């Protein structure tokens, strides 16, 4: 699913949202998540999963063109860990829909 497909789904699910408002909501959420991760914070969405950072230590690599050894510096990369409900749902074992899919749940 692409970002534009996510925006379209959000607009379909909530008819009171104009497509432009749904796009703004998705962009705002993604910006907030990006900002939090860039500051080293962890993001947890219960029932869905968590986003965090994994540290990749410095290492000696090899330039594929010249074969020369190069020092690759330490870096942090974003990482997603799915929650139990999402893992079970993807695996097909969960009998109940996620709370966000429950039309009777008016949060």
From Swiss-Prot:
The record's annotation in InterPro entries points to:
Hist_DNA-bd (IPR000119), IHF-like_DNA-bd_dom_sf (IPR010992), IHF_beta (IPR005685)
What assembly does the database describe for this protein?
Answer: Heterodimer of an alpha and a beta chain.
Which keywords has UniProt assigned to this entry? DNA recombination, DNA-binding, Transcription, Transcription regulation, Translation regulation
Q: Does the keyword Transcription regulation apply?
A: yes
Which parts of the sequence are annotated with region: Disordered? Answer: 56-107
* Domain of life from the UniProt record: Bacteria
What the entry lists under SUPFAM superfamilies is as follows: IHF-like DNA-binding proteins
Give the record's family classification.
Belongs to the bacterial histone-like protein family.
Q: Which Pfam families match?
A: Bac_DNA_binding (PF00216)
Describe the task this protein carries out: This protein is one of the two subunits of integration host factor, a specific DNA-binding protein that functions in genetic recombination as well as in transcriptional and translational control.
Q: Does the keyword DNA repair apply?
A: no
CDD domains linked: IHF_B
Which Gene Ontology CC terms are recorded?
Answer: chromosome; cytosol
Basic and acidic residues composition bias: residue spans: 82-101
Q: What is this protein called?
A: Integration host factor subunit beta
What GO terms in the biological process aspect are recorded for it? Answer: DNA recombination; regulation of DNA-templated transcription; regulation of translation
Q: Which GO terms describe its molecular function?
A: DNA binding; structural constituent of chromatin
